[in-house]
Amino acid sequence: MNQVYESWMKGGHQHVATCSDCHVPEGFVSKWLFKAENGLHHGYAVTFKQNPVSFQATDKGKNIIQNNCIACHSEYAAYSIDATMKKGAPGSEPLSCVSCHRQVGHAHNF
């Protein structure tokens, strides 16, 4: 986890956003359900020594990050992101904020 924190410190949002600002959903109920679920997963991983070596966002996590980008940057995102556009060959993922701004939150790809 230290590598993730260090890369955030080198990224573009270290002075304006915390981990939760990008990685936790907005809204009281959504936020606390998310924190409870992640706390259980983290507790299990630590207890049974199954900490991931690398971190990859799940589809749910990618959706949360996208929604939080749009929430903070709504004045730009409303005119910039067309989720129906594809970034590559047919069948590839739709474009998202991090399709182009991959290293904004972290200086390295996590």
PLM region spans:
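Short sequence/structural segments immediately N-terminal
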Residues: 1-110
